[in-house]
Structure formats: structure tokens, C-alpha cells
């Protein structure tokens, strides 16, 4: 069985289809999507429907991202968050034109069921953004940090790579897991179009919202 982690999609349906075609998914493979399915490109609603359909054929895990929280709130209450509207929400709302109320309800259920993180059988952690508890995600007191935190990644960016894992200076919160996979902060921010690996953490948000990668 193969496991594939797929970073932030942000309404990029065509790019998503290209990725899955290249992977040549087989029965028994596992797809882990890292959140932020909407807001960015013009086909957010279509991405959500596509993911729902894919989950009927393959084993999928869908993590919740901060943009998914915004879209969920809009689908549930029709309230438009001003920050969301300015950061892709407008395009997402437009993508839902032509979708029936029943289809929108189906998408709301999809968003409401999204887990905040996933730990697989190999003790690999998958979550959208980060966490702050030194005792691991199970002890995180502020659940919204799973899809908003950047302190984990920013800590790693300035970490001295000479620090050994058994050192007292090695970050305690990343010691709990074999590997950690996150999105949320585009690697293009650091002039890199590929995933970035620091210590046992992989940032796989390669900027699909901006450059479609």
C-alpha cells in the first residue's frame, strides 16, 4: 500500500486531476489531503465535489484547513467573513453558482466531518498548519491552531541543523512523531516550488493558490 500526501489545493481542479493521474492510484493506496480545498482558483465547489466522488473509489483522509473553516461557516450560516471574502472567498462563492441547495448541504456535511489531524500506523502526523503543545497534538489546548499555527514551521526555519535528536535543545513537540506533514505556509514564500524538509517535518504546500504547483 502506498500513501500519498497532497498539499493545499485552493480550487485548482485541473491541477488536482493532473496530480492524481500522474500518481496512477491503485486499489489499496491511501490519499491524505492536507486541507484548504477552496479559495484561490475558480473551481472550489467543483474541487469539493470531485473529492467527495474520489472518496467513493479510494481510501481518503481529508484534513481541515483554515479556508475550509471559512467556507463551512458560509455554507452553514450564509454569513460572509470579510477576511475570507478578500482571501479567495469571493471566488469560492461564485463557484457555487449553479449548485443546488441539496448539493451545498452535502458539501457542508463534508466540511463538518473533516478531522483536524491524522496519525497513521507508522506514527506519521498529518495536519494543515501546526500545534504548540510540547506533549503532542492530543494535548493541544487550542484546537484552531491545527489549521492556523505557523510557529511550528517558523521554529524549524531558524533551527540549527547541527542539533542532534537526543539533544536537550531538540524541539520536544516534534519528537513524538516519526514524521510530520504540514501545509498552510507556501514554500514559494521562500523561493522554493518543491516541498521543504527540515528535521522530521515536511512542508508540502507548494503554492497552488498562487502559481498552480
Regions found by a protein language model. Give the residues of each.
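Beta-strand-turn-beta hairpins that frame and shape the catalytic cleft
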Residues: 1-4, 119-125
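Conserved beta-sheet core of the metallophosphoesterase superfamily
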Residues: 164-213
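Active-site glycine-centered loops adjacent to acidic/histidine catalytic or metal-binding residues
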Residues: 8, 35-36, 65-66, 183-184, ...
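Histidine-centered catalytic micro-motifs
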Residues: 9, 127-131, 180-188
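N-terminal active-site segment of His-dependent metallophosphoesterases
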Residues: 1-50
Amino acid at each position: 500500500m502506498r500513501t500519498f500526501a497532497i498539499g493545499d489545493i485552493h480550487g485548482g481542479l485541473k491541477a488536482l486531476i493532473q496530480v492524481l493521474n500522474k500518481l496512477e492510484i491503485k486499489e489499496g493506496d491511501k490519499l491524505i489531503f492536507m486541507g484548504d480545498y477552496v479559495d484561490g482558483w475558480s473551481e472550489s465547489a467543483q474541487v469539493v465535489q470531485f473529492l467527495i466522488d474520489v472518496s467513493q473509489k479510494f481510501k481518503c483522509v481529508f484534513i481541515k484547513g483554515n479556508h475550509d473553516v471559512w467556507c463551512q461557516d458560509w455554507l452553514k450560516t450564509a454569513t460572509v467573513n470579510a477576511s475570507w471574502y478578500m482571501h479567495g472567498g469571493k471566488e469560492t462563492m461564485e463557484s457555487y453558482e449553479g449548485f443546488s441547495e441539496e448539493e451545498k448541504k452535502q458539501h457542508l456535511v463534508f466540511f463538518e466531518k473533516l478531522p483536524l489531524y491524522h496519525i497513521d500506523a507508522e506514527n506519521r502526523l498529518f495536519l494543515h498548519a501546526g500545534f504548540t503543545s510540547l506533549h503532542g497534538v492530543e494535548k493541544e489546548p487550542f484546537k484552531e491552531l491545527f489549521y492556523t499555527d505557523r510557529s511550528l514551521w517558523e521554529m524549524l526555519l531558524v533551527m540549527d541543523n547541527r542539533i542532534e535528536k537526543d539533544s536537550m535543545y531538540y524541539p520536544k513537540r516534534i519528537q513524538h512523531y516519526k514524521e510530520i506533514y504540514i501545509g498552510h505556509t507556501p514554500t514559494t514564500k521562500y523561493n522554493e516550488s518543491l516541498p521543504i524538509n527540515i528535521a522530521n517535518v515536511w512542508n508540502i504546500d507548494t503554492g497552488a493558490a498562487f502559481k498552480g504547483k
